[in-house]
């Protein structure tokens, strides 16, 4: 399942790779795989995150209503279609502002059921959220509470495709399908993800508005005091804020759009306090 947000494109490539492999080896398919590549087609066509003209986030109207407005009617149809499935994977990219390491996100009230699946997904990181912070109008929340185990993956950045991230998740999906008996092939070797809870994540934000210039080439392991980047003031030729890691750990979210305003997210760092 992907395409809920029209500016999240990694899922398009993931669906392409899955269909390509299914078509290449139909004899290996031992179950039913339903693929929803674009549940917000108007958003994808116009490159907008929400549903055009309605200014509405598609991932805020589930489980929908058969007698409701257009978006609610579509959401209800999607839910009805998926009910009874053994598993659903909701694939997202980040927005246009930050880049995300391939990760699986699950609620703490569903982690006992979902964590074994999440570990098979070939993600680098599994982030376990407090259920209090999760909106009950999302697809994943609705399906989990209706009895369909649902994982949420996040990767890359909005309006872009990162093929390496996509291929990693595709390998994870086929690994998961092999373990579930849906795909008749040897399970793939996958990453052993870092498991984090919300309390182990530090949010680094901009103290003032300016231009962010990254000092790290990529996300991954860092040490305490590592120079992550600077927020600069071009007119005065000065550094407004030097941003360093407060802990040993990994950066799994990093600013992509250089223009920042006070309070904007620069990075998320997992590690000890």
Regions found by a protein language model. Name each.
Residues 1-273:
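Structured catalytic-domain cores with a bias toward divalent-metal coordination
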């Amino acid at each position: 399942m992907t395409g809920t947000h029209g500016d999240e494109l990694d899922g398009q490539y993931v669906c392409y790779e899955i269909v390509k492999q299914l078509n290449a080896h139909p004899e290996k398919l031992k179950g039913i795989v339903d693929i929803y590549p674009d549940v917000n087609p108007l958003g994808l066509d116009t490159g907008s995150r929400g549903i055009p003209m309605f200014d509405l986030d598609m991932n805020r109207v589930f489980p929908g209503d058969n007698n409701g407005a257009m978006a609610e009617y579509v959401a209800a149809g999607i839910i009805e279609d998926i009910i009874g499935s053994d598993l659903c994977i909701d694939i997202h990219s980040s927005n246009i502002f930050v880049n995300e390491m391939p990760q699986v996100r699950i609620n703490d009230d569903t982690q006992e059921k979902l964590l074994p699946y999440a570990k098979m997904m070939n993600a680098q990181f599994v982030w376990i959220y407090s259920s209090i912070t999760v909106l009950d109008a999302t697809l994943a929340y609705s399906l989990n509470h209706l009895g369909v185990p649902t994982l949420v993956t996040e990767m890359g950045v909005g309006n872009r495709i990162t093929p390496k991230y996509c291929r990693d998740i595709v390998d994870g999906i086929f690994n998961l399908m092999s373990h579930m008996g849906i795909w008749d092939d040897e399970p793939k070797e996958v990453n052993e993800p870092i498991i984090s809870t919300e309390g182990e994540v530090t949010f680094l934000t901009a103290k003032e508005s300016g231009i962010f210039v990254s000092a790290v080439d990529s996300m991954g392991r860092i040490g305490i005091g590592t120079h992550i980047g600077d927020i600069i003031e071009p007119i005065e030729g000065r550094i407004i804020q030097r941003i360093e890691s407060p802990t040993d750990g990994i950066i799994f979210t990093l600013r992509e759009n250089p223009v920042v305003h006070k309070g904007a997210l620069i990075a998320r760092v997992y590690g000890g306090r």
